[in-house]
Amino acid sequence: MAIASFRTHGIMTPHDGVTAQIGNTPLLRLANLPELYGVNSNVELYAKAEWFNPSGSVKDRAALYMIEDGLKRGLLTPGKTILDASSGNTGIALAMIGAARGYSVEICLPSTASPERKRLLELYGAHVIETPATLSTDGAIMEAHRRYEHDPEHYFYPDQYNNSANWKAHFFGTGPEIWQQTDGRITHFVAVVGTSGTFTGTARRLKQYNPDIQVVEVQPDNAFHGLEGMKHMPTAIVPGIYDPNLADIRMGAGTEEAQAITRALARHSGILTGPSGGAAVWAALNVAQTLEEGMVVTVLPDGGSRYLGDSFWDDSDTE
């Protein structure tokens, strides 16, 4: 099984909007890297290619689920502005959906976010409020909360870090997709954590299918990391949806190690992903190296095109 996908490739009809294409992303078998890193040939490594979502990241799933939930509960009504804090990808997803559905969007974003992310937000028509780099995503969270508290009638505030609709998007979407795409053969699930929605929802669903599946949570290895979108939970504002008891294994990824794997994925597997995807594959490889047989599945949250201005691509190593 080289590539598995349940995305429909039929002819789109006029009423098929952009949000209808969210989810059902391909599951790619990682080529070459497992052999290079000494993984037993009886161990299979796969990754969900989340840049196939319309705005280019896994966050399309949670953004759509939170917006649909807000509409059902009467929290998002005509004329309201969608407001949230983001390291970039959720903001881009909210901006895309807002543009498609006629809502204004404001995103509080750390000033360290890549220029590509800021530009994408602007192209979708979002108003970007930059927050201090020293506070990382925590500063963006505090600013979004302050703005909402000042004028709650003006905003729909999904609050992705504390909204159960975030992880439910993966419980009802990503988890079942992985189970179907692997024919239930998955033995290990590996995911990085930021809001923790992808990890929490997917892990809970996979455990429901098979309690013996090992779930691996990946955080940055220290507070002063360079992995956009990921949280070092011991030193950050912990999301309300984060479940510290869910992981069977918890791993800390170093920034340089994750960046090295990000480069290696491009050079040896033809996969251009972002640094958080590099962290996920770094952890997946480390898990796979300990196994005699099995199937390890991870999630690549976004593509590498929104990080092309980052200097880590220029490293002269020879992974």
Predicted regions and their residues:
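PLP-dependent amino-acid enzyme catalytic core
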Residues: 1-319
